[in-house]
Amino acid sequence: MLVKRIRAVLPGICIAMLASVSHAQTSYSTDWLANTFGTLSTHVGNGARSLWVAPEGVIYTASRWDENAGGVAIYQNGQTLGTIGIHDEFQGGAITGNATSLFVALGYNRTFGSGSVGRYNRGTNQRDLRIPVSTWTGIQYADVITGLATGGNLLYVSDFYGNRVRVYTTDGVWQRDIGVAGPGALALDASGNLWVARQSAGVVAQFSPAGAAMSTIQMAAGARPASLYFDAPNGRLLVGDEGPDMNIKMYTLAGQPTQVGTFGVQGGYLDTTSGIKGQVGDKRFTRVAGIGKDAAGNLYVLNNAWGGGWDLGRNGSTDLHAYGPTGALQWKLQALNFEAIAAPDPVTDGTLFYSGNNVYTGTAGGTFVANTVDPFTYPKDPRLDMNDYQRGQHFGQLAMVGGNRILVASGQNPGNFNFYHFNSASGYIAIPDGSIPGKPFNTNLQVTAGFAIDDNGDVWAGLDRTNTISHYPMTGFDATGKPSWGKPAQIQIPRTVLPLTRIIYQADSDTMILAQGISGSWDWTAMNGHIEVYHGWKGGNTSAPNPVIDLTSANPKSIAAAGHYLFVGYVHTVPNIDVYDLNTGNLVTTLTNSNTSAMDVGNDVDSMYGVRAYLRSTGEYVITKDNYNGSSIVVYRWHP
C-alpha cells in the first residue's frame, strides 16, 4: 500500500520519498581488523619496538608514536593495563626496568634534542629524571640510544653514534664508558658481565663488570642480533636474530659461549616447510625486536613486521607473542595498521584484506595472515626504503585480472605508486614490479591529479601539471606473473573538474568518477566536494557528467566506489562514510558506528586513499577505512 501511494505522487516528491525509505531500510555492521582490541581505551599500542618484562609478568613496550595513547604501553595476561607518557615522548628503540623504575630512550625533543634516557616511577608512571647520554643531540629520525640494561644500582646505555656503552648509577651519575663500535641491545649475565649486540657485524660481545673485553659470539654470516635477554634460571643468553633465520638463538655461557638451541621456526615467516612463504603465526617470527621472561618462566617475543621507512612510528608494527614454559603459544597482542588501509581481496571475494605490507582476515580484530615483504630476496623493495619521503607504503589497492592479483602500495598522500604481483612459488610475498613514476610507465612525473587501477588492470593517472589523464592499458602477464602496460592514451581533463585530484574508473560499467581539488590551494591532496560521474566514458562521453555530486559535508578526503555506489570519507570533521548513488547522485545512507560497545571508528580519514570498497558476489558491500587512532582498520559490511 505504501509503494502505491508513493507512486501516485509527483515525480520529484516520489524520488525524495524513495531516497528516504532507502536510507531508513539500509542495514550495516561495523567491525575492525588489525588490532586485538577495538576501543581506544583498550587498543594495543602502535609500533612497539622494544620491551621489558617485570618478574610478575607485567610487560612494558616502547613506541616512537601512538596517536591516541602514551608511547609506553603496559600489558599483562593478554590485556591492556594502560600507558605512560604522551604519544611522541619516546624513541621506541630501547627500554628496561627494575623493581621501582623504568628507563626509556626518549624521542627527539626541541629542548634537549636526541640521545637522552628518561627514568619513570613504576608506581606513579611519572618521569622523575632525564639522563643526557649522547653528544649526538641532533638526530631526529634514527635511534641514538640503542640498548638499555640495569643491574643492581647501575644503568647501562648504548650510545650508538658515540661508539660506546655508558654506565651510570640508576640515579643518573656517570661511572665509566666502554668502547664498542655500533653498540645495540644489552644484557647482563649472572656474574654481572655485560653482553652487547653489534647488529650489523653479527656479533655479541662480552665485557667484564669493569669494562674489559672478554668472549665474543660471532654469529653466522647474515645474522643480525637485534635483541638480547639473559635467562638466569637456565644460564642462557637468548639472542633475537633479525637475519634470514628470524628466530631466537640460545647460548650457554659456561666457558666459551656455545649455541645449544633455538626457539622459533628457522626462516621465520618466510619458511616454506611449515607454512606458506610470508605466513606469520605461532613461532613464525618476523623481526625479533624484543625478548623477555617472567618469574613463572613465560617467554614474551616482540615482533615487528617488515615494511616502513625513516618514520620509526610507521616502521614495523606491534606483534607480541606470549609462550608458556613448555613453549606453547598462550596469547598474542597486535597493532598492525597505523596510517594504512587494507583493500578487500577480489580473488577471495572479500575474505582476505591486503594492505601495502600485510594480509588480514576475520572479524572482531581478525587474524594477521601474512607479511608480504621479503627483505632478503627483494632488499630494494620500495616498502623498505629508509629514504622514502612518504614514510612507508602502507596503503593497499588491489586488482584481480584473470585470477592474478596486482597490489599497488602507496603512502598517506602519495605522488608515486608501487606495483607488485604474486605467484605460487612466492606464496604471500608481493614481488616488486616498479612504480609510477618509473620505468614501467615511462614517466618521471609525479601523480598529483588522481590515480586508479581498474578491474582490467589498466592504470589511470593524472600526471603533474599535464591537465590530462594518462590511461595505461594493461598488456598482460609474463610466465612469472609479472604484469606490463602499454603506451598511454592522453585524455583531456574536463574543464569543469579542474584542478583534478581523484580518479576512479569502473571497467564493468564504463563509469568514470572525477573529483575536483581546490583551485589555488597549496594542498594538492585536498578535495572541494565537487564530483562528476561520467557513464560511458570509453564509449565517448567525456564531457557530459550525469550525475554531478556536490557534497554538503565539509572536507572530503578519500573516495572509493563499488557497484553503483560512491563512498566518501572526511578529514578534520566526522568519522562517517557517506554513501551516494552513482546513478542518481543522491545520498543513500551514512555509515557511522553500529558497534559502539566493542569498538571506536576514529576521528576521520586523513589520507587520500584511506577508504576502499568492494561488492561481494552475495550482494554485500565491504568498505574499509583507516583508523589511525586505534591502529586498526574499520570494516563496514553494508546491505542496501
Language-model segments: residues:
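Conserved beta-propeller blade signature
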Residues: 58-60, 102-104, 155-157, 193-196, ...
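Beta-strand-rich domains and repeat architectures in extracellular enzymes and scaffolds
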Residues: 39-68
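Blade-level signature of beta-propeller repeat domains, shared across WD40, Kelch, NHL, RCC1
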Residues: 341, 359-361, 602-640
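Short loop/turn segments that connect beta-strands within beta-propeller blades
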Residues: 75-79, 121-125, 168-173, 207-212, ...
